[in-house]
């Protein structure tokens, strides 16, 4: 392992050379209270940026041990640290000049969900963060002076402000960790109370726009119907109330623009924990939930869709069905069967994105097309059996089909 001064000398020695000379920098360098590892060097300044990582020992980082004692706490802490690092590097990205991607400093972007990511990991040795740096060049000539700024001026500031407990807002981090524990508690309560989902009173479900996952300003907070309102005593937040959706078959109905799909979309993402301030912090759904839709044109390989589709005109065997170009109904049937194979216990469906002929056949169409002429058994005829025989619940948005 080399020290930081040896890296500085290497930078001076390759300055103004051809860009491939940067590859000599690959290796691990000691920067006092952290290790800098240059893992992959880009081929030229216009290629995907170089891969760099930093390792900080637990002794130096000094986070309380309970913050990384199990998978939930490690995932939550890593998510928090990644967001802090993303915020810090955004102040310095492209401040080092050059051509192409020169000066870029970036890490995997975190959206509103708290997820396990390879960008930041915690093990028994310490914290590892992986990110990208555009090594600077003028044309295809190395500009080591600018890379020196990144590695010796910008990066130490970002690391210090992001990965050392003494540099962070301890109360803010504690609130972040406690929220995750409250969310995990609700996940556990769902099974104990025979529920498949929970939506807290006061939740903000609408999003800012179709391309933004941030909460919509001035939106109406969720208010549970009295018939479904329950209360929970959380470990940290205390008592909260909201709508508990029981296992079984649940219909979400209402007029247009009344939030049916918005509620279903929130339930879809309720399998993940959300960050404070998202509005959906206490929208919690069964971890096995799957959002299903028609996927016309998809590939299907050896799936038994005979539960829904039989006696196709071309004599194709639906017990082991394959196609390169599925129809709307066969694609949705395959999606349901695949979800059953994956042990899903909750299906989420919206009639707007479903194949109508797969979902329902009204009385008029049953008279027009006799049952022996129709290969499709509608989902609504199977929904009760799915719950009673396989324990699979359904939440369905309906606005036009009875």
Regions inferred by a protein language model and the residue ranges of each:
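Glycine-rich phosphate-binding P-loop
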Residues: 240-268
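Flexible beta-alpha connector loops of hexameric P-loop NTPases
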Residues: 298, 308-329, 361-376
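Long, charge-dense accessory insertions within large macromolecular proteins
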Residues: 164-220, 291, 297, 316-320, ...
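Post-Walker A helix-loop "phosphate-sensing" segment adjacent to the P-loop in P-loop NTPases
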Residues: 269-280
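N-terminal pre-Walker A segment at the start of P-loop NTPase domains
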Residues: 206-241, 284-289, 293, 298-300, ...
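Conserved P-loop NTPase nucleotide-binding/switch module
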Residues: 340-388, 400-401
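Phosphate-binding/switch loop-helix module in NTP-utilizing enzymes
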Residues: 320-354
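N-terminal accessory targeting/assembly segments
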Residues: 1-185, 190-194, 205
């Amino acid at each position: 392992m080399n020290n930081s001064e040896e890296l500085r000398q290497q930078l001076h020695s390759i300055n103004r050379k051809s860009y491939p000379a940067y590859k000599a920098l690959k290796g691990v360098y000691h920067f006092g209270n952290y290790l800098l590892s240059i893992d992959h060097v880009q081929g030229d300044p216009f290629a995907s940026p170089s891969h760099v990582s930093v390792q900080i020992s637990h002794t130096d980082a000094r986070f309380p041990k309970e913050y990384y004692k199990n998978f939930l706490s490690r995932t939550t802490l890593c998510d928090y640290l990644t967001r802090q690092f993303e915020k810090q590097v955004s102040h310095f990205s492209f401040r080092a000049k050059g051509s192409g991607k020169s000066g870029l400093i970036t890490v995997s972007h975190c959206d509103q969900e708290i997820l396990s990511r390879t960008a930041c990991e915690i093990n028994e040795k310490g914290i590892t963060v992986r990110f990208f740096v555009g090594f600077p060049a003028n044309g295809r000539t190395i500009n080591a002076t600018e890379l020196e700024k990144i590695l010796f001026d910008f990066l130490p500031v970002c690391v210090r402000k992001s990965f050392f407990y003494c540099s962070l807002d301890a109360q803010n981090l504690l609130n972040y960790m406690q929220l995750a524990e409250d969310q995990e508690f609700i996940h556990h309560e769902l099974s104990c109370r025979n529920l498949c989902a929970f939506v807290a009173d006061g939740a903000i479900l609408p999003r800012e726009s179709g391309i933004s996952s941030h909460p919509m300003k001035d939106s109406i907070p969720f208010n549970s119907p009295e018939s479904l309102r329950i209360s929970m005593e959380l470990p940290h937040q205390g008592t909260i109330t909201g709508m508990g959706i029981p296992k079984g078959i649940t219909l979400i109905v209402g007029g247009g623009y009344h939030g049916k799909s918005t509620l279903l979309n929130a339930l879809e993402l309720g399998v993940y924990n959300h960050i404070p301030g998202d509005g959906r912090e206490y929208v919690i759904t069964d971890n096995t939930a799957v959002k299903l839709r028609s996927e016309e044109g998809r590939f299907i390989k050896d799936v038994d869709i005979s539960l829904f589709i039989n006696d196709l005109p071309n004599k194709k065997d639906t017990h082991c069905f394959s196609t390169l170009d599925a129809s709307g109904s066969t694609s949705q049937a395959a999606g349901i069967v695949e979800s059953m194979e994956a042990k899903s216990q909750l299906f989420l469906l919206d009639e707007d994105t479903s194949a109508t002929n797969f979902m329902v056949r009204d009385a008029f169409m049953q008279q027009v097309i006799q049952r022996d002429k129709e290969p499709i058994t509608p989902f609504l005829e199977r929904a009760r059996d799915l719950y009673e025989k396989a324990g699979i619940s359904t939440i369905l948005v309906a606005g036009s089909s009875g």
